[in-house]
Each structure stands twice: as structure tokens, then as C-alpha cells.
Amino acid sequence: MMNNMGDLMKKAQQMQEQMQKAQEEIAKAEVTGESGAGLVKVTMNGRHDVRKVDIDPSLLSEDKEILEDLLAAAVNDAVRRVEANQKDKMSGMMSGMGMPPGFKMPF
């Protein structure tokens, strides 16, 4: 019984270390959201910090409202990509630990 408890504690510690490593990788990962067929691009890291905004020069002569809409759409696209990347990383890690798909960790 004591040996099983020791194994369980060791496994829990390994899971926590793997989770921390995955969270660090997710935070560093960068994705680029786009709108207007790539005329506006927003690069964001896994913590949702916007790292770069790229606006095609042809849009600078357009109506301000159009540019604002395209920028908002690009940011929203980047947020969705960050969330998809997080989900992929975590589900890959969970399946590697033998956890069922969709299992939510308590931390």
C-alpha cells in the first residue's frame, strides 16, 4: 500500500512538472491572426500579448472605420488561434499521461 502511495505521489509530481513545462511553452508560442485576406496581421503570444501589428500600406488610404474593423477581426482571429494552440498542447500532454480526452485538471 505504501509503495502504491509513493508511486502515486511521484506520478502527480511528474504531471505537475509536465503541466508547468507545457504552460511555459504555450506562453512563448506565437501565432498570427489575419483579416482582409492578409492585409491586416496581428501576432500574439500565448499570454494574449500583442507582439506585432502589420497593416498593408494600401489600407492606410482607406476609411478609418474599415481599418478598425479589419484590425479587430485580426485580433479576434489571433485570440482564437492562441486558444486552439493551448487546447492542442494540453490535449496532447493529457493523452501522453493516459488521461481521457477533455479531462480537466483541478489546477
Curated annotation (Swiss-Prot):
Any Pfam family hit: YbaB_DNA_bd
InterPro entries reported in the protein's UniProt record: YbaB-like_sf, YbaB/EbfC
Top-level taxonomic group: Bacteria
One GO location term (cellular component): cytosol
UniProt record similarity statement: Belongs to the YbaB/EbfC family.
Function: Binds to DNA and alters its conformation. May be involved in regulation of gene expression, nucleoid organization and DNA protection.
HAMAP family membership: DNA_YbaB_EbfC
Name this polypeptide is given: Nucleoid-associated protein Maqu_1612
Classification of source organism: Bacteria, Pseudomonadati, Pseudomonadota, Gammaproteobacteria, Pseudomonadales
